[in-house]
Every structure is written in structure tokens, then in C-alpha cells.
């Protein structure tokens, strides 16, 4: 997995199909490339990295999410390199 986009850098990724929603209802998609970090924003622009722990359960930040793929906690069940929030 690509891990934290702050490490991979690059432009905001294109994405494939929507695969569900975060707990707050924002759509999550499987990203297909690297991303630029946009701290504190989740679903407030066309495509943004979800880097807001409040968008999950109020305790987990992006790094924890990427490390918890598939655990059934805050992470979605899908295995994805990067996860984005969209409007």
C-alpha cells in the first residue's frame, strides 16, 4: 500500500468507483495514485484526502486509518492504497 500521502506526494489522485461511505456519510473512493495532503478537510472540495480524525470516530487520524485497513474498526473493509473523501 502507498501509505500516508504526505510521504508519497504528487497531485491529487484520480479515483475508481465509490465503494461506500465514512461514518459521517461522506463517500469514500479507492484512489489510483498519490495525493497531496490537505489537513483538516474531509469532503469539503471535489476530491480531498480525508485527513480529519473527526471524519472517522473522533480518535483516529489518517496514519492510523492507513495502518488499520480491514480491521473492522474505523477502517473500511476494502484494502486500498489511499482513501479520499468527496462531496
UniProtKB/Swiss-Prot annotation:
UniProt-listed GO biological process terms: defense response to bacterium
Disordered, as annotated region: 65-87
Keywords: Antibiotic, Antimicrobial, Disulfide bond
SS bond partners: 42-50
Domain of life: Bacteria
Name assigned to this protein: Antibacterial substance A
Amino acid at each position: 500500500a502507498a501509505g500516508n500521502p504526505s510521504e508519497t506526494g504528487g497531485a491529487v489522485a484520480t479515483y475508481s468507483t465509490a465503494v461506500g461511505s465514512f461514518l459521517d456519510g461522506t463517500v469514500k473512493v479507492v484512489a489510483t495514485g498519490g495525493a497531496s495532503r490537505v489537513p483538516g478537510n474531509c469532503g469539503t472540495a471535489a476530491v480531498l484526502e480525508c485527513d480529519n480524525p473527526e471524519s472517522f470516530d473522533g480518535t483516529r487520524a489518517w496514519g492510523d486509518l492507513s495502518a488499520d485497513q480491514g480491521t473492522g474498526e474505523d477502517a473500511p473493509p476494502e484494502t486500498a492504497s489511499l482513501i479520499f473523501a468527496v462531496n
